[in-house]
């Protein structure tokens, strides 16, 4: 089995070395970047499986780099940052981060979250879960299981971040069934739901913007107040 490769994007050398040591102790190959230029260079030359990134970086900050990353690749992304206000967390998740941890962090919690994301990112895992399918069709749209993309009725393709793809795959596999936030978060990230965790709601809001004519009054992914969500699309 190929050793997973983790890219740490962090400008503080002490923190970067700490993260490198933590992940290497878990058996991962670790690459380091202190800014966006180095990040893109490493991504272009190595098959990275997970990115762990700070927000406060020299030059382009982590939020801008995450947006660029999402336009190019569908990699698991964890923000690890000293910025702990709710606005930054929601914005990070809106852009497409799969997880968000604040400093100071618990090394054990970080490695567990990283391991869960890597497990769900393995190509064979996606193939096992799709039972030989290449796509799902619903309401004129298509979820491509190979490219992890949503394709419009006109043929335009939108690459989905890992968490959005996992949520959509779960919805398409379970049409019409109530999905609790606990179930969705477990499918998306592998972690348990905690109080005030809005990861699922933010991810659903991003997904709805793709295909709901009126995202605030959706008719494909319905909100079941106090319980969760239900996918009401017409699966073909």
Swiss-Prot record:
Keyword DNA-binding annotated: yes
Response regulatory domain segment(s): 5-118
GO molecular function, one term: transcription cis-regulatory region binding
Gene3D superfamilies, A to Z: 3.40.50.2300, 6.10.250.690, Winged helix-like DNA-binding domain superfamily/Winged helix DNA-binding domain (1.10.10.10)
GO cellular component term, pick one: protein-DNA complex
UniProt-listed GO biological process terms: regulation of DNA-templated transcription
Free-text description of this protein's post-translational modifications in UniProt: Phosphorylated by ArcB.
Compartments, record wording: Cytoplasm
Record key words, sorted: Activator, Cytoplasm, DNA-binding, Phosphoprotein, Repressor, Transcription, Transcription regulation, Two-component regulatory system
Principal localisation: cytoplasm
DNA-binding region listed in the record: 133-233
Any Pfam family: Response_reg
Positions where 4-aspartylphosphate occurs in the chain: 54
Matches recorded under InterPro entries: CheY-like_superfamily, OmpR/PhoB-type_DNA-bd, Sig_transdc_resp-reg_C-effctor, Sig_transdc_resp-reg_receiver, WalR-like, WH-like_DNA-bd_sf
Signal peptide feature range: none
NCBIfam families: PRK11173.1
UniProt function note: Member of the two-component regulatory system ArcB/ArcA. Represses a wide variety of aerobic enzymes under anaerobic conditions.
The protein's name in its UniProt record: Aerobic respiration control protein ArcA homolog
């Amino acid at each position: 089995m190929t050793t997973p490769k983790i890219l740490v994007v962090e400008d503080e050398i002490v923190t970067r070395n700490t993260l490198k040591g933590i992940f290497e102790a878990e058996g991962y190959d670790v690459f380091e970047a202190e800014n966006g230029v180095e990040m893109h260079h490493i991504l272009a030359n190595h098959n990275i499986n997970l990115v762990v990134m700070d927000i406060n970086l020299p030059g382009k900050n982590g939020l801008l780099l995450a947006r660029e990353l999402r336009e190019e690749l569908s990699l698991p992304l964890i923000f690890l940052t000293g910025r702990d206000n709710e606005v930054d967390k929601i914005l990070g998740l809106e852009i497409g981060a799969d997880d968000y941890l604040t400093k100071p962090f618990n090394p054990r919690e970080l490695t567990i979250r990283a391991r869960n994301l890597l497990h769900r990112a393995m190509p064979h895992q996606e193939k096992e879960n799709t039972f030989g399918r290449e796509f799902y069709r619903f309401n004129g749209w298509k979820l491509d299981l190979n490219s992890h993309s949503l394709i419009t009725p006109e043929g335009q393709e939108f690459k989905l971040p890992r968490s959005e793809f996992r949520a959509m795959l779960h919805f398409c596999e379970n049409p019409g069934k109530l999905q609790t936030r606990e179930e969705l978060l477990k499918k998306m990230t592998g972690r348990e739901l905690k109080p005030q965790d809005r990861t699922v709601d933010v991810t659903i809001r991003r997904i709805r913007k793709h295909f709901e004519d009126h995202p605030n009054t959706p008719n494909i992914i319905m909100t079941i107040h106090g319980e969760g969500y239900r996918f009401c699309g017409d699966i073909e």
